[in-house]
């Protein structure tokens, strides 16, 4: 229990009691809940701030600082138990996606993207879990279709053979959250594998992932890491876009941020936060790839939970390196 320092009979004013205690302890810094960049560290109301200032002697007023770093370090740090649970939760997320991207759920030519979205929602409820955001399922394909399959897409886009299907999905359990984007290919009649050009495109997305996570170094800021990753990716002829964020007690948590959709040069505040051990991230990014066979660009949009600890970076429960195949025959059949 936290010991109370206020005796109402001796000092009716809480603010005076707080001020007297601060003076008696003579701290060199007085951390308060204010922050320019992190909402989680910016909860002190203006009225309370004014009352605190008015109650303190002037020399102590000058010692007031933001306690932002303390709040962010606490919220971003994962315990060993949380790391073990996180792996299990991410595994459940992968399993739901794998089942959603199968003929158990999808009948090519009949099932639409919203059908899959709501199947995912219902699956989560059956498992007594929660989602922290509404899932999305979208399609990229040959012919005239939007490069940004997730932006302005028709809600009832029927999934067809030859489609590249993408989802963005995350669940919540025991205060932790996952955030995952994966890709599937719908086999055409007679096909047993995805086209080589799509498999090569996925490899480009994986290479951008490596360019980012291979440069995770303790003490390096998100903006520094982002700059290196983009430079290395472009040197390999890739077209990257990185928007990786902290993950844990919140889906978009506080901590080191590596780019945003509209901030590929760096992010003020959270991008300047250094990388610490025992922290988790949604490794979220995409690689734009021109597909000759489709005469258009596509985006390989990927997102996987990652952990940075004393041994370096690792994926919490693996990452996608092969396309999920929708319509694949059972292995016992020839």
Predicted segments with their positions:
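Active-site neighborhoods and metal-handling regions in enzymes and metal-associated proteins
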Residues: 1-334
């Amino acid at each position: 229990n936290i010991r109370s320092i206020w005796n109402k009979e001796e000092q009716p004013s809480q603010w005076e009691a707080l001020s007297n205690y601060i003076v008696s302890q003579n701290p060199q810094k007085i951390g308060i809940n204010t922050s320019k960049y992190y909402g989680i560290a910016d909860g002190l109301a203006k009225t309370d701030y004014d009352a605190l200032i008015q109650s303190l002697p002037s020399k102590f007023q000058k010692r007031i600082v933001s306690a932002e770093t303390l709040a962010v370090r606490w919220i971003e740090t994962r315990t060993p138990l949380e790391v073990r649970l996180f792996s299990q939760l991410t595994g459940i997320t992968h399993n739901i996606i794998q089942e959603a991207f199968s003929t158990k759920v999808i009948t090519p030519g009949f099932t639409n993207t919203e059908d899959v979205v709501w199947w995912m929602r219902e699956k989560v409820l059956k498992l007594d879990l929660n989602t922290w955001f509404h899932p999305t399922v979208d399609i990229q394909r040959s012919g005239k279709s939007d490069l940004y399959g997730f932006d302005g897409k028709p809600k009832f886009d029927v999934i067809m053979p030859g489609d590249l299907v993408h989802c963005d999905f995350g669940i919540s359990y025991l205060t932790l959250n996952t955030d995952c984007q994966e890709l599937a290919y719908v086999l055409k009649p007679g096909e047993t594998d995805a086209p080589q050009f799509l498999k090569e495109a996925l490899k480009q997305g994986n290479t951008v992932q490596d360019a980012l996570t291979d440069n995770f170094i303790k003490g390096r800021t998100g903006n520094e890491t982002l700059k290196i990753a983009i430079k290395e990716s472009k040197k390999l002829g890739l077209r990257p876009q990185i928007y990786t964020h902290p993950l844990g007690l919140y889906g978009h948590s506080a901590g080191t941020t590596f780019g945003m959709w509209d901030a590929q040069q760096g992010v003020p505040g959270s991008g300047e936060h250094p990388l610490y051990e025992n922290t988790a991230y949604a490794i979220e990014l995409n690689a734009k790839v021109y597909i000759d066979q489709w005469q258009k660009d596509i985006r390989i949009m990927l997102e996987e939970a990652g952990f940075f600890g004393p041994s370096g970076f690792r994926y919490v429960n693996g990452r996608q390196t092969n396309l999920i195949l929708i319509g694949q025959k059972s292995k016992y059949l020839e």
